[in-house]
């Protein structure tokens, strides 16, 4: 098993531009965008804050691509789970070029994070705030998995709704 290796990429970042959605001859959607991830630290020598931003090319396929095209915009924060792929292509002058991308296929995940952008409908499909018994994932929620197209997602049994957590009578002061 160890000889096969693992190719899994997890990113949380912000879109650098609106997704570009195209359709293959087979009818399947493909979305491309760049994702910025940043880290910041304090320079030990000068004490000033430093920041480094990395840009990642992301490619989504199928239903995920359609969802990205409809709901994601420049600046949207998103969680991506996919695989690293390098593809070879030829430019107009005949030179071979290589591009490394994070590919989100059937087994991958894309989850929208943060609040809604602009004045459109909420990405979470009208999630409610607070209240006991609310589902952890909003109804029609904002998590999309590439596998959702080919296999139904298992639902956990429903917990008793509209009841606050049980109040335990114990002597612990916190």
UniProtKB/Swiss-Prot annotation:
GO molecular function: single-stranded DNA binding
Domain SSB as annotated: residue spans: 6-111
Motif Important for interaction with partner proteins: chain residues: 169-174
Biased composition (Gly residues): 115-133
Annotated GO biological process: DNA recombination; DNA repair; DNA replication
PROSITE patterns from the UniProt entry: SSB (PS50935)
Keyword check for DNA-binding: yes
Keyword flag Repeat: no
GO CC, any one term: nucleoid
Keywords, ordered alphabetically: DNA damage, DNA recombination, DNA repair, DNA replication, DNA-binding
Biased composition (Low complexity): 134-160
Gene3D superfamilies in the cross-refs: Nucleic acid-binding proteins (2.40.50.140)
Record-linked InterPro entries: NA-bd_OB-fold, Primosome_PriB/ssb, ssDNA-bd
The entry's DNA-binding region: 55-61
Ranges where the record places region Disordered: 110-174
Function according to Swiss-Prot or TrEMBL: Plays an important role in DNA replication, recombination and repair. Binds to ssDNA and to an array of partner proteins to recruit them to their sites of action during DNA metabolism. Stimulates the ATPase activity of PriA. One tetramer binds to 26 nucleotides (nt) of ssDNA, a 55 nt piece of ssDNA probably binds 2 tetramers.
Subunit composition and interactions: Homotetramer. Binds PriA via its C-terminus.
Designated name of the protein: Single-stranded DNA-binding protein 1
Annotated source species: Klebsiella pneumoniae subsp. pneumoniae (strain ATCC 700721 / MGH 78578)
Lineage start: Bacteria, Pseudomonadati, Pseudomonadota, Gammaproteobacteria, Enterobacterales
Protein's gene: ssb1
């Amino acid at each position: 098993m160890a000889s096969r290796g693992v190719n899994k990429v997890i990113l949380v970042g912000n879109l650098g531009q609106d997704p570009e959605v195209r359709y293959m001859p087979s009818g399947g959607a493909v979305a491309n965008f760049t994702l910025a991830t940043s880290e910041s630290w304090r320079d030990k020598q000068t004490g000033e804050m430093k920041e480094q931003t990395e840009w990642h090319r992301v490619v989504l396929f199928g239903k995920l691509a359609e969802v990205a095209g409809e709901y994601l915009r420049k600046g949207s924060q998103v969680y991506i789970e996919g695989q690293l792929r390098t593809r070879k292509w030829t430019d107009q002058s005949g030179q071979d070029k290589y591009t490394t991308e994070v590919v989100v296929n059937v087994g991958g995940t894309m989850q929208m994070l943060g609040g809604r952008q602009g004045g459109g409908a909420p990405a979470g499909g009208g999630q409610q705030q607070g209240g006991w018994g609310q589902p952890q994932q909003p109804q029609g929620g904002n998590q999309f998995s590439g596998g959702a197209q080919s296999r139904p997602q298992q639902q956990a049994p429903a917990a008793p709704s509209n009841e606050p957590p049980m109040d335990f009578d114990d002597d612990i002061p916190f």
